[in-house]
Amino acid sequence: MATAAMLCAARALRPRSWIPGTCQAQVRHTHQRASLLSFWELIPMRAEPLRKKKKVDPRKDQAAKDRLKKRIRKLERASQELVPIEDFITPVRFLDKSRQRPQEEHSFEESERRALLLKRWALYKQQEHEMERDAIRAMLEAQQEALEQLKLESTELYAEAIKRDTSLFPFEKEGPHYTPPVPNYQAPEGRYNDITKVYTQVEFKR
C-alpha cells in the first residue's frame, strides 16, 4: 500500500515535458493572475454569521421615532449656518492642466523590443499556468487512486484519511511582498500637525 502511494505521489510531482514549436493557445491576462498553487481567499471565508435580530418593544420604537421627529422640527425652525466642505474644494494650483514633465519618446526599435518582451513574458506565464494546472490535476488523480487503494486495504484507515483536519484553519500567511524589506529601517513615530479647521454651529432663535 505504501509503495502504491509513493508511486502515485512521484507520478503527480513529475514535471510535464514541453515540446518547443507546439501550438499554444493564448490566455488573456494570464501574466496578471495569481498562481494556482497559492491560497485563494474567497469572500464567504471573510464573512461572519448573521446576527440574531432582537425583539424591539413597540413603545420604545415609537418613542424613538417621536424624538427624531421632534429633533427634525427643531432643526427646521432654526436657520443654521452652512459649514464649508473643504474636502470637495479643489485648490486653484491643481486646476492647471499643463504637464510639468515632458513625455519620453521611444524609438521604433525600442517600442518593438518592449512589445516583444511583453509577449515573451505572457507566453512564459501561460506555460507556468498550464504546468501548475496539470500538476494539480495529477495530484488530485493520484490522491483519489491512493484513497481507493486504502479503502480496499482498511475501511478504518480510509475513514481517518477523509476526515476533516481542524488544524488547517484559521489560516495565516505572510507575503508575498512587492518589494524586499529595507534593512535597519526605522519607522516614523507618527507625529503630525493637525491643521483641521473647527467650526462652531450657531443656532439662531426666532
Swiss-Prot record:
Region Disordered, annotated ranges? 170-190
Q: Which GO terms describe its cellular component?
A: mitochondrial large ribosomal subunit; mitochondrial ribosome; mitochondrion
Transit pept. (range):
1-46
Places the protein is found: Mitochondrion
Keyword Lipid metabolism listed: no
Q: Name one Pfam family in it.
A: MRP-L28
Q: Which UniProt keywords apply?
A: Mitochondrion, Ribonucleoprotein, Ribosomal protein, Transit peptide
Location, primary (coarse class): mitochondrion
Is Mitochondrion tagged as a keyword?
yes
Highest taxon listed in the record's lineage: Eukaryota
Q: Which family does it belong to?
A: Belongs to the mitochondrion-specific ribosomal protein mL40 family.
Q: How does it assemble?
A: Component of the mitochondrial ribosome large subunit (39S) which comprises a 16S rRNA and about 50 distinct proteins.
Specify the protein name: Large ribosomal subunit protein mL40
Organism, per UniProt? Rattus norvegicus (Rat)
